[in-house]
Design a protein with these regions (language model features):
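A conserved ligand/cofactor-binding region detector
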Residues: 1-187
Length: 187
């Protein structure tokens, strides 16, 4: 294994978060802050927060590899994880800092949180159980991974039309999913 190189960790100050969000908007999404819409600001915020999560995730993976730790692998057809931004902010302890950074740019964090789509990865008890199981692994500090099916159109929305159930696709990936890393070499 190659030795990790030295780099500057993304900082968590309000000013650093403000710059990071604006940078992601301009250079990852390719949008001018003057004309960006709410969803583009949401994605920029998600990418900036993801950077801070990834550092911890990579450090955790590196520790597990160096110790040859056993891991739990959980396979489920569903993962009902819900919207992720507010949970990530609370887990990182940066909710108020991100809120302050966005307010300094004239944005409301709660409005952006409401803009985030629910991942179309489940809609029942099995999905909730899987999410709780993974949350328990993280809370207990146990190494583990969850595997499932990534549905392009979700688990379908169910509506009642003229007294009958009607299913329709859930376009949860309409704007992409900033939490994901595309792995073109993996199927």
């Amino acid at each position: 294994m190659n030795a990790p190189f030295t780099y500057a960790s993304p900082t968590l100050s309000v000013e650093a978060l403000k710059h990071s969000i604006a940078y992601k908007l301009m250079f990852t999404i390719g949008k001018d802050p003057v004309i960006a819409n709410k969803h583009e600001w949401l994605n920029a915020t998600l990418f900036a927060v993801r950077d801070r999560l990834v550092e911890r995730w990579l450090r955790s993976n590196r520790a597990q590899l160096s110790q040859e730790t056993r891991q739990v692998y959980y396979l489920s057809m569903e993962f009902l994880i819900g919207r992720t931004l507010s949970n990530a902010l609370l887990s990182l302890g940066i909710y108020d800092d991100v809120k302050g950074a966005l307010e300094a740019m004239g944005l409301d964090l709660e409005e952006l949180i409401d803009e985030e789509n629910d991942p179309g990865l489940g809609n029942g008890g099995l999905g909730r159980l899987a999410a709780c199981f993974l949350d328990s692994l993280a809370t207990l500090g146990l190494p583990g991974r969850g595997y499932g099916i990534r549905y392009d159109y979700g688990m379908f929305k169910q509506n009642i039309v003229d007294g009958r159930q009607k299913e329709s696709p859930d376009y949860w990936l309409e704007y992409g999913n900033p939490w994901e890393f595309k792995r073109h070499n993996t199927r």
